[in-house]
């Protein structure tokens, strides 16, 4: 029987008035306790996650402990934690959405032994707040009362420890109830977890940081920054148009002086601004940090500044102070922060000399973040000297108006500076990637496929699915060595003479139930993360590399889209969607499929499925397969031509493919040939994605997950147009169609790299393609600019993209004949889907950044130990693709590197080239025009560098103790190093990349072995960062089609 109570809430309006609101509050005789000791599990309805039965006690943190020590409670060693609803609501109301979401994710994580107890809805636990009672006292009293009830509910069989920071509560409740202990959190760690050193260090760091924060607030100092405006003033100002809301983006090359606010939401439509807002200097930034959602006030036009066009080396000073900036742009100052983007930051402690300069007895240390865009952070620690050579993680606690720098606390050690594992861990933390091995609870949900217990198609599925095993020739075309085959194709002639085209995708959703442990984990990861030498799978390998991989000769579940096409025009007559059973006949690799398409049948000997066939049967099978590949290619040509007529773009993408041996070791790197079968497979996938998008939108117009690609801002094309003009080309950017036609015609027969670079610039100008919920967007905004399609989604890679899993469920619900209620209930509402899309978009950006950063790490490690003065491989050909006021940007086709080459050095000397092209530094000046830059010495000698000139470049590494190492480019001659873009150069470049990986990996292994021999190996907690270990830098390119040209939908972030 429910009991009704009234709950009084005091809410503050935008105008500052306080409103008293009374709401109904219902109490229940039972709520889920989630304990295995529950005497009445049916009554409590303990259907979800249960506490471990192996713990010696349960621990209940009060509201203050949850607020201040949540990161300690995240340690997996701490088990049997019961979070009371009262404490969770305190976090939500007092610490904001970010920490509250962190707590929610902790509760959902199957790896952490913690549960939520809704004490405020349990009639015996709920205590009304007494008149005049402080909120904090009521919260503590309510949590203690709930702890006592929980102890008795479990029939006094499990001691309960309530941890609190309230000394009065410890004195009052410490010995009140036998079996319920009330102690401080510090005492709890000392008594129950004395050997958990990392937790003690983190707890001490938090306590020290809190004490200093409290002491600083009592001291009076001169203000370094103005106060932020109250929330109600900010919201009113945004509504009236006086203030502008946006996301702060700090320029990593000028982190101290230059940041931009990208307009967000209504601000972008109402302000009338077409460009970002410049925030010049740290004072105008007013304690906001890169990624914060800020509120900006525009300065008068007389105070507007321009962005600097000079190259800069990520130093704290303004290196371009003597350079002329670009034309003034809207400039403003931050007046408030709506949402902080504080996260874990990887930092480096100062060297001994720097520590001494801060004071001998100073416990407050300024640490330097790995990310240039983050300001130095002041932390308190006595371990500064011991941790000088390590990368460590810190968190920001506060940033007062009286402090130049934010205050934070030490969290944990990652690894030694320069050590491969430490640097990889740094990349993961910096991109908020926290991927640990799948838990036991998650793996228990997985199917079994062993020699003793092989997986088989179930009779029930045979009845409900369309069986294609004996009626369709199904085959896959993938890179060599690919194991996670998530798509296959088929084509056949129907009885009426028309054709049937089929795209068959692994049926991941059959094995991943909605809201199961593995589904929640996959949703959290959102994507498979591919780093340079390893990957972190979204799903366990039993699915990604086995039961959901459409391998040849085995039965597999699939979700298929099949079209009936006109036999001559290939116009689509009708389409069928559904679940199928397939048995792929051939697992082809691209080169073999292309050889068959070209009529070179000697490649048959390399196709395993043909080796065991008799000659007569072999010839018949070969003719059948060749016909299918040819027909698929012909269909794909027609589909592509139709999209081309609508303005589909072909932009610059990845151009390398790895060739692996049977043991998955790297064998060779070969040039990425523009094979037609790449386009064939890509067009079939795009077609499937397009038709599935139309289907799920028709069925769920307000809650379908689609992918939009907005038209880019025209101002982003300015550099592309200027560069093309330098070569005599005109780029029309008014639409995707005119842009595509212009790029196709911008070819220099003497230098193919020109078109390659122009397409690369067009890629840089593109907006990001994003997932969205159709209920949150007008239909005219659904359009995909790059693919020239009115509706598009991702359906074809559910093994490595959670978005595709959502789309599969939408499609299944859309075609369900009986419209089962449970199918619909598992779909996301528009609001929840939009939130999920934001999460997936964020995780996709993190995946892209981490992959790029890890590749750059290996490049630097390769060149770091080479002498650039004597090593032949360090001198290469480069092509200039952009002019700056003090240098040029250069592309190195041999290694695929882009970077800055200075024409004026730190001493103010300019580059001078002799008759043979060799360079040296002399006093002089630089004169820049639109498509060239002239270096003139004091003696009157001059050298001119034009856009698209080929120059000889020396590659070296600029080491950094606090940040990542960087590739440094230096022009050593204004003459080409060799004939530009020859096949020999291109091929040798790929071979060198192979050597890069091997040498870096070998060097790391040798260094680790040497450390072990000396007995000086320092134990580092980095195993949590390693999951699926790769064998080479480019193994990932073999395993993920998203990064290769064959998946046109993703080659330019579509």
UniProtKB/Swiss-Prot annotation:
Q: Which SUPFAM superfamilies match?
A: Nucleic acid-binding proteins (SSF50249)
Q: List UniProt keywords, sorted A-Z.
A: Cytoplasm, Exonuclease, Exosome, Hydrolase, Magnesium, Nuclease, Phosphoprotein, RNA-binding
| Enzyme Commission number, as recorded | 3.1.13.1
Give the primary localization class.
Answer: cytoplasm
Query: The CSD1 domain covers which part of the protein?
Result: 236-313
Q: Per the record, what are the reactions this protein catalyses?
A: Exonucleolytic cleavage in the 3'- to 5'-direction to yield nucleoside 5'-phosphates
Cellular component, GO annotation:
centrosome; ciliary basal body; cytoplasmic exosome (RNase complex); cytosol; plasma membrane
The record ties this protein, via InterPro entries, to: Dis3_CSD2, NA-bd_OB-fold, RNase_II/R, RNase_II/R_CS, RNR_Ribonuclease, Rrp44_CSD1, RRP44_S1
Tell me the protein's name: DIS3-like exonuclease 1
Which organism does this record belong to? Rattus norvegicus (Rat)
